Amino acid sequence: MTNGFHIRYLQRQEIDIARWDDCVGRSANSLIYGFHFYLDAMTAGQWDALVLDDYQAVMPLTWRRKGGVSYLCQPAFTQQTGIFSPSAITPGLTDAYLQTLIRHYRFAEIFLNHGNAHPTLRTQVNLVLPLSDSYPVLESRYKKDLVRNLRLAAGAGLV
């Protein structure tokens, strides 16, 4: 138990895939990078996980081994991983995950997703478009030039 959170380290073969994908899919910060099929494809199944309680929050741990030392790394074509949860991810939860992570790996070079805030982490520019609103609401925010260009493209049969 770390900071009041019960986080378990699971090896790939111990993970309940249906519950894993359900947790990632229902997360407000859901990304394809967190689903098991993507992780399996990008790491040849060489990933483990940190799981909170009964899959309330999950974090994939993509690892490699060099010189007998296991370390965390970002897989190719994977912008970000980190913690996925349908509930709010607090800095306290992020801290508990990081504390659990450092007990298992001596070195890590990973990029957490935009939903994993923590005061001690270095942030990078990450352009995330919030597209959860309906299309008419999104369309109402278009600039006049874009609306004009879309109308012209539709008139020319391009869209």
Residue ranges and their predicted role:
Residues T90-N126:
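Non-catalytic accessory segments adjacent to catalytic cores
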Residues F5, I15, D22-G25, F37-A96:
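Conserved donor-binding loop and adjoining core beta-sheet/short helix segment
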Residues R26-S27, G45-Q46, H104, G155-A156:
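Structured helix-beta-strand junction loops
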Residues R64, P86-A88, N113-G115, P130-S132:
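Beta-hairpin (beta-strand-turn-beta-strand) motif
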Residues H36-A41, N113-A117:
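Short, solvent-exposed loop/turn elements at beta->coil junctions and helix N-caps
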Residues M1-I15, A117-V159:
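Acyltransferase donor/substrate-recognition loop-hinge adjacent to the catalytic core
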Residues N29-F37:
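Short Pro/Gly-enriched beta-strand edge/turn motifs at strand-loop
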Residues C23-R26, A41, Y97-L101, P130, ...:
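Residues that form generic nucleotide/phosphate-binding pockets
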